[in-house]
Amino acid sequence: MLKPLGDRVVIEQVETEEKTASGIVLPDTAKEKPQEGRVVAVGTGRVTENGEKIALEVKEGDSVIFSKYAGTEVKYDGKEYLILRESDILAIIG
């Protein structure tokens, strides 16, 4: 499994089927990049300038909303993930 370092988080993006107002299903090439996902792994936390380690607020299993162009897309074990910093996460859902 992927183990992110520091304040990074591994996200499994939630794919939703997009339809127009008239009910036409959009192909993958026309879809917006998803901004919602599930946290599958978290790093150990960030370190402040004076060496203090601050734990991350998100945890494995959290559903989150993140910045549209945040992170780095990676493929691991046949699945696609997004690795981003906790500061790129805008909200925890639920």
From Swiss-Prot:
Induction: By heat shock.
Subcellular localization(s) per the UniProt record: Cytoplasm
GO biological process, one term: chaperone cofactor-dependent protein refolding
Keyword set, alphabetical order: Chaperone, Cytoplasm, Stress response
Pfam families for the chain: Cpn10
Stored PROSITE patterns: CHAPERONINS_CPN10
Molecular-function GO terms, alphabetical: ATP binding; metal ion binding; protein folding chaperone; protein-folding chaperone binding; unfolded protein binding
CC per GO annotation: cytoplasm
Assembly and binders: Heptamer of 7 subunits arranged in a ring. Interacts with the chaperonin GroEL.
Function: Together with the chaperonin GroEL, plays an essential role in assisting protein folding. The GroEL-GroES system forms a nano-cage that allows encapsulation of the non-native substrate proteins and provides a physical environment optimized to promote and accelerate protein folding. GroES binds to the apical surface of the GroEL ring, thereby capping the opening of the GroEL channel.
Family: Belongs to the GroES chaperonin family.
PANTHER family hit by this protein: 10 KDA HEAT SHOCK PROTEIN (PTHR10772), CO-CHAPERONIN GROES (PTHR10772:SF58)
NCBIfam families: PRK00364.1-2 (NF001527), PRK00364.1-6 (NF001530), PRK00364.2-2 (NF001531), PRK00364.2-3 (NF001532), PRK00364.2-4 (NF001533), PRK00364.2-5 (NF001534)
Protein name, UniProt field: Co-chaperonin GroES
Organism whose genome encodes this protein: Halalkalibacterium halodurans (strain ATCC BAA-125 / DSM 18197 / FERM 7344 / JCM 9153 / C-125)
